[in-house]
Amino acid sequence: MIDQFEFRKNLVLQELENNKIPFSFDAIIGRGGLVKPIPGGVYEVNEAMKRDTVHAMRTHACNLGGLIASKLASTLPNCPAFIADPGVVDELEDIARITGSPLMPKITIWHALNQKAIARRFAKEQGTQYESLDLIICHLGGGISVAVHHHGRAIDANNALDGEGPFSPERAGTLPAGQLIDLCFSGQLTKDELKKRISG
Protein backbone atom coordinates (compact mmCIF):
# COMPACT_ATOMS: atom_id res chain seq x y z
CA MET A 1 0.00 0.00 0.00
CA ILE A 2 2.90 2.38 0.71
CA ASP A 3 3.78 2.25 -2.99
CA GLN A 4 0.51 4.12 -3.66
CA PHE A 5 1.66 7.16 -1.66
CA GLU A 6 2.44 9.46 -4.61
CA PHE A 7 -0.63 8.34 -6.55
CA ARG A 8 -3.00 9.05 -3.66
CA LYS A 9 -1.26 12.29 -2.66
CA ASN A 10 -1.65 13.51 -6.24
CA LEU A 11 -5.35 12.60 -6.17
CA VAL A 12 -5.79 14.90 -3.17
CA LEU A 13 -3.99 17.73 -4.96
CA GLN A 14 -6.03 17.12 -8.12
CA GLU A 15 -9.28 17.23 -6.14
CA LEU A 16 -8.28 20.61 -4.66
CA GLU A 17 -7.43 21.92 -8.11
CA ASN A 18 -10.64 20.57 -9.68
CA ASN A 19 -12.67 22.38 -7.04
CA LYS A 20 -10.58 25.56 -7.24
CA ILE A 21 -9.57 25.32 -3.57
CA PRO A 22 -6.33 27.23 -3.00
CA PHE A 23 -3.51 25.27 -1.36
CA SER A 24 -3.41 27.43 1.77
CA PHE A 25 -4.22 25.81 5.13
CA ASP A 26 -3.66 26.40 8.84
CA ALA A 27 -3.63 22.64 9.48
CA ILE A 28 -4.15 19.42 7.52
CA ILE A 29 -5.78 16.28 8.86
CA GLY A 30 -5.67 12.82 7.29
CA ARG A 31 -7.37 9.55 8.07
CA GLY A 32 -5.40 7.75 10.77
CA GLY A 33 -3.54 4.57 9.96
CA LEU A 34 -3.17 1.25 11.75
CA VAL A 35 -0.61 2.41 14.29
CA LYS A 36 -0.29 0.97 17.79
CA PRO A 37 -3.62 0.99 19.69
CA ILE A 38 -4.43 4.39 21.22
CA PRO A 39 -7.43 6.06 22.88
CA GLY A 40 -9.75 8.14 20.73
CA GLY A 41 -8.74 11.72 20.04
CA VAL A 42 -6.77 14.02 17.75
CA TYR A 43 -3.04 13.37 17.36
CA GLU A 44 -0.34 15.40 15.68
CA VAL A 45 1.61 13.38 13.13
CA ASN A 46 5.22 12.89 14.29
CA GLU A 47 8.17 10.73 13.25
CA ALA A 48 7.24 7.84 15.56
CA MET A 49 3.72 7.75 14.13
CA LYS A 50 5.09 7.81 10.58
CA ARG A 51 7.41 4.87 11.38
CA ASP A 52 4.51 2.92 12.89
CA THR A 53 2.40 3.63 9.83
CA VAL A 54 5.06 2.53 7.34
CA HIS A 55 5.52 -0.70 9.35
CA ALA A 56 1.85 -1.10 10.28
CA MET A 57 0.47 -4.36 11.65
CA ARG A 58 -2.03 -4.59 8.76
CA THR A 59 -2.27 -3.32 5.20
CA HIS A 60 -4.97 -0.73 4.47
CA ALA A 61 -5.23 2.50 2.48
CA CYS A 62 -5.81 4.41 5.74
CA ASN A 63 -2.10 3.92 6.49
CA LEU A 64 -1.40 6.65 3.94
CA GLY A 65 -3.66 9.31 5.49
CA GLY A 66 -1.28 10.68 8.11
CA LEU A 67 1.71 10.36 5.78
CA ILE A 68 -0.02 12.35 3.03
CA ALA A 69 -1.25 14.97 5.51
CA SER A 70 2.30 15.34 6.86
CA LYS A 71 3.84 15.64 3.41
CA LEU A 72 1.34 18.26 2.28
CA ALA A 73 1.63 20.20 5.55
CA SER A 74 5.43 20.25 5.25
CA THR A 75 5.14 22.40 2.13
CA LEU A 76 3.30 25.16 4.02
CA PRO A 77 4.66 27.49 6.73
CA ASN A 78 3.66 26.61 10.30
CA CYS A 79 1.12 24.02 9.16
CA PRO A 80 0.79 20.97 11.45
CA ALA A 81 -0.61 17.61 10.32
CA PHE A 82 -3.03 15.56 12.40
CA ILE A 83 -5.04 12.35 12.46
CA ALA A 84 -8.20 11.74 14.49
CA ASP A 85 -9.83 8.60 15.88
CA PRO A 86 -7.88 6.06 13.78
CA GLY A 87 -9.25 2.55 13.26
CA VAL A 88 -7.03 1.22 16.07
CA VAL A 89 -8.74 3.29 18.78
CA ASP A 90 -8.73 1.00 21.81
CA GLU A 91 -10.97 1.97 24.72
CA LEU A 92 -12.18 -1.57 25.44
CA GLU A 93 -13.08 -2.58 28.96
CA ASP A 94 -11.13 -5.57 30.26
CA ILE A 95 -14.14 -7.88 30.06
CA ALA A 96 -14.48 -7.11 26.34
CA ARG A 97 -10.94 -8.42 25.73
CA ILE A 98 -11.86 -11.96 26.78
CA THR A 99 -12.16 -14.50 23.96
CA GLY A 100 -12.78 -18.24 24.00
CA SER A 101 -9.03 -18.95 23.73
CA PRO A 102 -6.08 -17.47 25.63
CA LEU A 103 -4.05 -18.01 22.44
CA MET A 104 -6.16 -15.39 20.67
CA PRO A 105 -6.51 -12.19 22.71
CA LYS A 106 -9.02 -9.75 21.27
CA ILE A 107 -7.82 -6.93 19.12
CA THR A 108 -10.13 -4.41 17.59
CA ILE A 109 -9.82 -2.54 14.32
CA TRP A 110 -13.02 -0.69 13.57
CA HIS A 111 -14.49 2.41 11.96
CA ALA A 112 -13.72 4.66 14.94
CA LEU A 113 -13.61 7.95 13.02
CA ASN A 114 -17.02 7.43 11.44
CA GLN A 115 -18.66 6.03 14.57
CA LYS A 116 -17.39 8.73 16.91
CA ALA A 117 -18.37 11.45 14.42
CA ILE A 118 -21.89 10.02 14.17
CA ALA A 119 -22.09 9.73 17.96
CA ARG A 120 -21.14 13.39 18.36
CA ARG A 121 -23.60 14.46 15.66
CA PHE A 122 -26.40 12.47 17.29
CA ALA A 123 -25.57 13.93 20.70
CA LYS A 124 -25.68 17.46 19.26
CA GLU A 125 -29.06 16.78 17.64
CA GLN A 126 -30.34 15.58 21.03
CA GLY A 127 -28.98 18.66 22.79
CA THR A 128 -26.52 16.69 24.90
CA GLN A 129 -22.90 15.48 24.98
CA TYR A 130 -21.48 12.24 23.57
CA GLU A 131 -19.84 11.73 26.97
CA SER A 132 -23.27 11.43 28.63
CA LEU A 133 -24.75 8.82 26.27
CA ASP A 134 -24.86 5.04 25.97
CA LEU A 135 -25.08 4.04 22.29
CA ILE A 136 -24.75 1.07 19.97
CA ILE A 137 -23.47 2.23 16.59
CA CYS A 138 -23.01 0.23 13.40
CA HIS A 139 -20.89 1.25 10.42
CA LEU A 140 -22.19 -0.48 7.30
CA GLY A 141 -19.81 -0.42 4.35
CA GLY A 142 -17.26 -2.69 2.69
CA GLY A 143 -16.66 -3.85 6.26
CA ILE A 144 -19.09 -3.69 9.17
CA SER A 145 -18.18 -2.60 12.67
CA VAL A 146 -20.50 -2.63 15.66
CA ALA A 147 -19.45 -0.84 18.84
CA VAL A 148 -20.87 -0.16 22.29
CA HIS A 149 -20.23 3.46 23.28
CA HIS A 150 -20.43 4.31 26.98
CA HIS A 151 -20.00 7.92 28.06
CA GLY A 152 -17.62 8.88 25.24
CA ARG A 153 -15.66 5.61 25.06
CA ALA A 154 -16.13 2.63 22.77
CA ILE A 155 -15.98 -0.11 25.39
CA ASP A 156 -16.51 -3.01 22.96
CA ALA A 157 -16.16 -3.36 19.18
CA ASN A 158 -15.52 -6.10 16.67
CA ASN A 159 -12.38 -6.45 14.54
CA ALA A 160 -13.98 -5.35 11.28
CA LEU A 161 -10.73 -5.32 9.28
CA ASP A 162 -10.08 -9.01 9.89
CA GLY A 163 -13.67 -9.96 9.12
CA GLU A 164 -14.96 -10.52 12.66
CA GLY A 165 -18.66 -9.86 13.15
CA PRO A 166 -21.31 -9.61 10.41
CA PHE A 167 -20.38 -10.50 6.84
CA SER A 168 -20.31 -7.67 4.32
CA PRO A 169 -19.40 -7.00 0.68
CA GLU A 170 -15.66 -7.20 1.49
CA ARG A 171 -15.51 -9.34 4.66
CA ALA A 172 -16.48 -12.97 5.27
CA GLY A 173 -17.67 -12.24 8.79
CA THR A 174 -17.29 -14.60 11.73
CA LEU A 175 -17.05 -18.14 10.35
CA PRO A 176 -17.58 -21.57 11.97
CA ALA A 177 -14.21 -22.30 13.62
CA GLY A 178 -14.15 -26.01 12.79
CA GLN A 179 -14.86 -25.49 9.10
CA LEU A 180 -12.30 -22.70 8.93
CA ILE A 181 -9.62 -24.95 10.47
CA ASP A 182 -10.47 -27.69 7.96
CA LEU A 183 -10.19 -25.20 5.10
CA CYS A 184 -6.84 -23.93 6.39
CA PHE A 185 -5.36 -27.44 6.22
CA SER A 186 -7.17 -28.64 3.09
CA GLY A 187 -4.51 -27.43 0.68
CA GLN A 188 -7.19 -25.67 -1.40
CA LEU A 189 -5.89 -22.18 -0.65
CA THR A 190 -2.60 -20.60 0.34
CA LYS A 191 -2.47 -18.49 3.51
CA ASP A 192 -2.59 -15.27 1.45
CA GLU A 193 -5.50 -16.55 -0.67
CA LEU A 194 -7.46 -17.48 2.44
CA LYS A 195 -6.80 -14.09 4.06
CA LYS A 196 -8.03 -12.41 0.86
CA ARG A 197 -11.24 -14.49 1.01
CA ILE A 198 -11.84 -13.45 4.62
CA SER A 199 -10.97 -9.77 4.24
CA GLY A 200 -10.99 -8.78 0.57
What does each model-identified segment do?
Residues M1, E17-N18, P22-F23, L34-V35, ...:
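Non-catalytic beta/alpha edge segments that cap or flank active sites
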Residues M1-D3, A160:
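Short glycine-rich, Thr/Ser-proximal phosphate-binding strand/loop in the N-terminal lobe
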Residues F7-N19, I68, I118:
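Short, well-ordered amphipathic alpha-helical segments that serve as non-catalytic structural scaffolds
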Residues L16-A61, V88-T99:
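Short beta-strand-loop/turn "lid" adjacent to the catalytic site in phosphate-handling enzymes
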Residues A27-G30, P80-P86, I136-C138, D156-N158:
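General beta-strand structural signal in soluble alpha/beta enzymes
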Residues N63-K71, I83, I98-D134, G142, ...:
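Glycine-rich phosphate-binding loop plus the immediately following alpha-helix
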Residues C138, V146-A147:
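A residue-level detector for well-ordered beta-strand positions
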